């Protein structure tokens, strides 16, 4: 539990409190589908923060978009990775003077939001619940200037250059490392099946790290 003094000294905790939505603390969350939410006016959605114990660099945010609604467009300097807990919908992303690119997602989808890119989420006929992991705590404590964090127009073209296939599932194998690199996974529950792991091993993806660990 964060004290009143911590909220005054920590820019991120102070910003959290200003959003007016529940802040859950502790060592774990048993079921993200059942986390209590509150209306987040700044996002036009229901939301909650999750402050896991001793997590000072990253945070977790639960966002539930009502059926047929969309979130308020936002951009931010920090990184954000999103997983769809429930529902179906779509996300649009664009630079200030660029063209919108929209991709669809479903339960189990995982995608990354590049820094300083405008984005908004849409829900289809049922509520869509998303959980995000961001580096907002680090950035807010580092800069202590939310206008800069949420209104910087610098384009990180090395991260996102408006490529047509940016949000297409096309994982790149990280050789010698137990993992993949991708901007979008249609359903993470299906991706890491035994068959896919074996396929990666045949390409030299996982076996190398296993061998190294066993020596």
Language-model region placement:
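A short hydrophobic beta-strand segment most commonly corresponding to one strand
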Residues: 81-83, 112, 125-146
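Short acidic-glycine-tyrosine-enriched beta hairpin
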Residues: 54-56, 95-116
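A short, N-terminal "cap"/entry segment at the start of jelly-roll beta-barrel domains
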Residues: 1-57, 155-215
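A structural feature that tracks compact, well-ordered secondary-structure segments
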Residues: 60-64, 94, 122
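Histidine-centered metal-chelating micro-motifs
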Residues: 69-72, 90-91, 109-121, 127
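Short histidine-centered beta-strand/loop micro-motifs
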Residues: 49-53, 70-76, 93, 102-103, ...
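Glycine- and acidic-residue-biased ligand/ion/polar-headgroup-sensing regions
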Residues: 66-67, 76-96, 215
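His/acidic/aromatic-lined binding-pocket segments of jelly-roll/cupin-type domains
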Residues: 62-63, 72-75, 79-84, 102-103, ...
């Amino acid at each position: 539990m964060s004290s009143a003094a911590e909220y005054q000294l920590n820019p991120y905790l102070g910003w959290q409190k200003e959003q007016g939505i529940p802040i859950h603390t502790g060592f774990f969350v048993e079921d993200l589908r059942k986390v209590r939410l509150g209306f987040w006016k700044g996002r036009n959605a229901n939301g909650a923060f999750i402050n896991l114990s001793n997590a000072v660099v990253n945070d977790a945010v639960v966002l539930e978009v009502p059926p047929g609604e969309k979130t308020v467009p936002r951009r931010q300097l920090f990184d954000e990775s999103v997983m769809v807990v429930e529902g179906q919908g779509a996300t649009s992303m664009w630079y200030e003077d660029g063209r919108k690119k929209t991709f669809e997602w479903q339960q189990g989808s995982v995608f990354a939001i590049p820094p300083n890119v405008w984005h908004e989420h849409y829900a289809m006929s049922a509520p869509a619940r998303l959980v995000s992991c961001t580096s907002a705590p680090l950035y807010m404590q580092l800069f202590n200037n939310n206008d800069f964090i949420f209104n910087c127009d610098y384009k990180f073209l090395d991260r996102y250059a408006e490529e047509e296939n940016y949000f297409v599932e096309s994982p790149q194998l990280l050789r010698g490392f137990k993992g993949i690199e991708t901007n979008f996974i249609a359903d993470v529950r299906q991706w890491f099946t035994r068959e896919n792991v074996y396929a990666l091993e045949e390409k030299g993806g996982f076996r190398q790290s296993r061998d190294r660990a066993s020596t």
